[in-house]
């Protein structure tokens, strides 16, 4: 015992026991003492055997599960060895995935002491959270969406093609009605259509605007010929009424393709009206210029004639005066 106590006394100098006091003790000590102290160092009597029991290296704590593994090569090798030694592969592959929880014995020497989930369940959870499955599902959904879009696009294309085909057919029929020859089935329909065209031409002629010069020149003719003036006095409304009455009687001629011809005739008549008005204006200008030139020529001729007459009269008077003077 004496030798053991001597050993303890020799070890006392090597070890220092540091004790941290509480806040209340510090307040009491500061009140009792003049100078404040935060820490207090005391020497404790410890034996080497007790030191061996209390202190343990980090590897032992790691094996007991009291320390987390550090990311260092030796510790990683230890973890790999522990995982290789721990046999749970047979249990995992022997049981199906859809079964319930499998209780596996966990020893105190393994670092899985804090885990309450079995390895099979952990693998199942990891398989449920596998990103490849989610990518496959996402790709399948994308393919379905693409198929739906393709079906819609094909439907739209077919609808566009059908609408374009109908438009092209309608335009072809319309153009054929312009350039095709109109075939009259009945003589009465042909005669009525010809009479209608003649009436339209007469209406367009009556509705034409005549230039100013032609109106001046044609005034005495209209006054002399009462029949012509009566025909020109026909109003546009009367002609339109007659045209409406004839169009109601000639519905069969419209079905044979006379509408495009009437449209063409109206367009040509409108263009001819514009040309006639332009030509009438040009003629009016020319006629006014010619009249002015004639008036100038006539005035010059009159002036020359008057001058010549006055000169001849003056000469005759002079001759008579000279004769009287010689006689007297």
Curated annotation (Swiss-Prot):
Query: In the record, what terms sit under GO molecular function?
Result: kinase inhibitor activity
**Which residue windows does the record flag with biased composition (Polar residues)?**
223-240
For this record, the Gene Ontology CC terms, alphabetical, are: plasma membrane; plasmodesma
Could you tell me which residues belong to the region Disordered? 213-253
Q: Which InterPro entries does this entry report, sorted A to Z?
A: BKI1/MAKR1/3/4
Subcellular location per UniProt equals: Cell membrane
Which keywords does this Swiss-Prot/TrEMBL entry list? Cell membrane, Membrane
Organism's domain of life?
Answer: Eukaryota
Provide the leader sequence positions: none
Any S-S bridges, and between which cysteines? Answer: none
Q: What is this protein called?
A: Probable membrane-associated kinase regulator 4
Q: Whose protein is this, by species? A: Arabidopsis thaliana (Mouse-ear cress)
